[in-house]
Amino acid sequence: MRNAFTLLFETIEERKNNPLPESYTNYLFSKGEDKILKKIGEECSEVIIASKNNDNEELVKEMVDVLYHCFVLLAEKNIPLKDIMEEVTERNGKLSRVGDRREIDTL
């Protein structure tokens, strides 16, 4: 049985491969990577605000928007969802120490 994430990603890929004129997903693909990245940034800001405001209902909605736009980016970059799922599986259960994390050198 496919889960909701798989179904969403399949729908996004279907829109990419078989565009529908009124599709928001196709609009994002037609505008390109910069637009997709801008939307991810906007949605992340909305997640922060919803969390800060302790609005869990809005937080859930905004998290779904972030995931959707990230999935669009994956499709744009031709990265299959299975690659993400494999990485999650690989990391699952592994202890991560703060000192083992890479520092952010540039912003």
From Swiss-Prot:
Catalytic activity as recorded in UniProt: 1-(5-phospho-beta-D-ribosyl)-ATP + H2O = 1-(5-phospho-beta-D-ribosyl)-5'-AMP + diphosphate + H(+)
Gene Ontology cellular-component terms listed: cytoplasm
Pathway(s) this gene product operates in, as recorded in its UniProt entry: Amino-acid biosynthesis; L-histidine biosynthesis; L-histidine from 5-phospho-alpha-D-ribose 1-diphosphate: step 2/9
A Gene Ontology biological process term: L-histidine biosynthetic process
Keyword Hydrolase: yes
EC main group: hydrolase
PANTHER family in the record: HISTIDINE BIOSYNTHESIS BIFUNCTIONAL PROTEIN (PTHR42945), HISTIDINE BIOSYNTHESIS BIFUNCTIONAL PROTEIN HISIE (PTHR42945:SF9)
Name used for this protein in its record: Phosphoribosyl-ATP pyrophosphatase
Originating species: Bacillus thuringiensis subsp. konkukian (strain 97-27)
Taxonomic lineage: Bacteria, Bacillati, Bacillota, Bacilli, Bacillales
